[in-house]
């Protein structure tokens, strides 16, 4: 029964993550396909460059909600009794981590857009908000400061997700936070960093687009 529930959590969370809010908002608001502009991604950064701040903020918020909703759904499926310590508690944490990662995977490889979406940053933070708000807030602040000081959204995104992981290390080792939270941060930050590999190459070559540059 537990395996069936975990499978349900993964499938539903992946579908939630696959909802392409960047594509939907751009198509409805400006009758354009966001994938034909800029990076070709459906995330908030490309929406910002193409449609402006209001649309980008809406998309980022909706993408965050996807991640948080997936983690919340895992809690509902496993059951409230799993909040107790022991085997059920471990099952809940495992399910929540799976849900968050499945949502991130859905955002990156959405089934509705031939498996080409965004880079998963906002959805990752949505899952982190539901799992460990303090790490999400810290990582979000690092992201904003990093992007603001450097002018590069990609650099801010990478430092933000790594920052969330960096905070979870002492929280786990010293304060006794669940190891599963750190596992989520490790896998999520690694995946997002890999998805930014082209940006990293451009950063090193001095050719990365600035945050305020319009998409072409």
Curated annotation (Swiss-Prot):
Membrane topology: Multi-pass membrane protein
EC code: 2.3.1.275
GO CC list: plasma membrane
Source species, domain of life: Bacteria
Gene Ontology biological process terms in this record: phospholipid biosynthetic process
Reactions it catalyzes: an acyl phosphate + sn-glycerol 3-phosphate = a 1-acyl-sn-glycero-3-phosphate + phosphate
Keyword list, A-Z: Cell membrane, Lipid biosynthesis, Lipid metabolism, Membrane, Phospholipid biosynthesis, Phospholipid metabolism, Transferase, Transmembrane, Transmembrane helix
TM annotation in the entry: 6-26, 58-78, 92-112, 125-145, 158-178
Enzyme class: transferase
Localization: Cell membrane
Gene Ontology MF annotations: acyl-phosphate glycerol-3-phosphate acyltransferase activity
Listed pathway(s): Lipid metabolism; phospholipid metabolism
Subunit and interaction comment: Probably interacts with PlsX.
Functional summary from the UniProt entry: Catalyzes the transfer of an acyl group from acyl-phosphate (acyl-PO(4)) to glycerol-3-phosphate (G3P) to form lysophosphatidic acid (LPA). This enzyme utilizes acyl-phosphate as fatty acyl donor, but not acyl-CoA or acyl-ACP.
NCBIfam families xref list: glycerol-3-phosphate 1-O-acyltransferase PlsY
Family, as annotated: Belongs to the PlsY family.
PANTHER family on file: GLYCEROL-3-PHOSPHATE ACYLTRANSFERASE-RELATED, INNER MEMBRANE PROTEIN YGIH
Protein name per Swiss-Prot or TrEMBL: Glycerol-3-phosphate acyltransferase 3
Organism: Dehalococcoides mccartyi (strain CBDB1)
